[in-house]
Structure formats: C-alpha cells, structure tokens
Amino acid sequence: MEYQKPFIYIDTNFSPADGLFIKMALDSFDFELVGLSANRSFMSSRAAGENILGLVNNEGLYLSVAKNYDDLESKYDNEIFTAEDDYFEDMDAFENLYDLASDCGRLDIIVSGDLYNIAKACREFEDFTDYIDHIFLLIPDLKDLSKEDLADLDLILSSGIEVFAIDQNFAKNFILEDKDLKNIIKNHPQMEKLLKSYDEEPLIGALLLYLSQRPEAFIFEEAGLKVNFDEKILEKVNSRPKAYLVNKVNEESFYDYLRAILCD
C-alpha cells in the first residue's frame, strides 16, 4: 500500500519565530501543507496574512491563505514580504479551514497562537471535528487570557479531537542560538529583514511542528483537561477526552531537526 503523507493546516501569525516556523513547514517534505490562516496573536490577521502570502510566494509556491474577518489593528503590523499576483481566499479563515478539511477528509492542525479560527469552525460546523485527526497547540498562561479566549481553549479540549499541547512555560526555554540565527540568514538571506528583530522569542511553532512529525521524541502527561473560568487554571477531569501535554523532549534532537531544515 502506497504511503500517503499527512495533510497539515497551519494557523499562525508573523512574529520572527512564526516566520521561521512557516519557512520550516514550506521546506519540509514529510507532509502535505494544504493551507494557512492568520490569527491575531502578534500582528493583525490582515497584516500577518499578507506577510504569509508574501513568504509563500517568495518560495515560488501558491497555497490557500485566509485571514480572520473579525480583525483588529496591531502596533506590530509591518510589511516584510509582499505577495505577487496572489490574494487571500474570499472567505473567512474558519470557513476556509472547514472547506479544506472536508476536501481532504482527514487533517492535522498546528496552531501557534490564539484558537479563535479553530474554535469558530467547531461552533459553526457540526461535522467539522469529523475531519480533524489531531490539533497541536500552545497552552498560554491562562491568567493572560480573556473570557472569550478561555472559552475557545475549553471548547477545543472538549471537542473530542486528539489534542497535543505544549505549555508556554515549557516552550520558553527553546530559543534560537546566535550561531543558528546567522546560519539561517546566510542560507536564506530573504529572511534577514524578519529575523533582524528576533529577540529570544520562544520557538513555539517550530516545537509544535516537531511534535507533529516526531511525537516519539516527547514524553507526555495524559489527562482530560477543563478550564476553570473563575480561577483561570486548567483542571484535570475524567469526564473529558484525554489530551497529551508535553513535559519532556530531547532538546538536542529538536535543534538537530531545526538545523536539518534551515541550516544545512
């Protein structure tokens, strides 16, 4: 039987670490990247999406890219890459995600920011979860989240989709070393404008990508998780589907993975 590469959908933004994550995904041969959407975790969705389109085009590729219509401007909005003869999908990100998922039949999602686009797809389409195999996501400090963001996280944790999660406190120690930064810019000079502002930002997207492709390199704690909205904490419960929360990874193997894609 012929091996079929998994279908991957990415929901992210365009900070320096996000841009690296996207570049890694575009250069990977382990999966089929079917589309991307821009969330609102750094730049506005519009600005992030335009940069994502530009980076994708810069690589000589054309992929489905959508933005969030419920958008807000951000002080971080900046044009780094410009799209040439390519445009956003003419629908909201959550609708585009649903269309791609239903077309593919089975899909994995990697989310390196807020969960709004994914949660809205869950709310608007009853059969959305039927098409999603796994979600790889970051669990941020819940004290910093709005009630709406907490509700989005709780919905995903209760959806029945298999969730693999990395806690923000775990991810914060994974940063780009200066020698690797220099090597990446040397090998990919088009990334210099973005990476010159890199300042020890955790490599969240890259970690999630590695998690999606090499889960055997990680050790997990398995538990059903529920948001306590009053205390803004996660509670372990038996009534929820088990999520897989990362508590250990071979750091050297992660950096080897990153360097193999970006530095070699």
Q: Model-flagged regions — what are they?
A:
Residues M1-D264:
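N-terminal acidic, glycine/proline-rich low-complexity segments
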